[in-house]
Amino acid sequence: MTRSPSQRGFTLAETLVALFVLAIVSAAGTGLLMGASSSSKQLRDKETEIRTLDMAQAFLRNDIAALSMRATVPETGFGAPGNLFGNASDQRGPILAFVRSGWVNPQSREDRSTLQHVEYRLENNTLIRTATVRPDAVTGTPRVERILLEGVSRIDVRFLRGGEWSREWQGDAGQALHILPDLIELEIVFEDERELIISALTGGRI
């Protein structure tokens, strides 16, 4: 029995053409999915980067805004007291070190004041914030370290007081302890040559 033209199946050539078209469509679809997945990952990475930068800026701004005139003595117990120390990252010691106020202690539940000593330092291209539970820390005083930024090559810091800038601040170097800068500016340079500038007014000014 012969089949009518409407009942005739696909020829081999037609089948091969259909498979070829299907392969092209599938490849295009896979490419679109991979592209979308890559774009989604890039977006997530960018969002993570922005959150990290925002958090680092928030810590620095909040700490500087809460800067206290309270002087501290070196952890060793030797040396003059000081209320603010600052240097560029290529110098010895922390980039910033000072006492901040406003550390909330609801109903005085913990055996501590609202003051804490904070330090910012650059180690192995990583910006680290260290906070102690007491302003006058000694060996064994509990402290909390937090990594704020990675991939940092250099940090420069400037201090503005009465319209004049200086690149270091030594709170025990012949200055009255009640004198604080009006503004602190940090220029953070990353290994990929990006730059982040953070300027913050200080607390405890007179």
List each language-model region with its residue ranges.
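Extracytoplasmic beta-strand-rich oligomerization domains located immediately C-terminal to a leader/signal peptide
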Residues: 28-137
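Short linear sequence signals and composition-biased patches located at protein termini or domain-edge surfaces
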Residues: 151-206
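Short solvent-exposed loop/turn micro-motifs enriched in small/polar/acidic residues
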Residues: 111-113, 139-140, 150, 179-181
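N-terminal single-pass transmembrane signal-anchor helix
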Residues: 1-36
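Local beta-strand/beta-hairpin segments that build beta-sheet-rich folds
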Residues: 127, 146-153
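Short, surface-exposed coil-to-beta transition loops
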Residues: 113-117, 142-143, 197
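Short aromatic-glycine motifs in intrinsically disordered, low-complexity regions
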Residues: 134-147
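A broad, low-specificity signal marking well-ordered, structured residues that form hydrophobic/aromatic
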Residues: 96-97, 146, 184
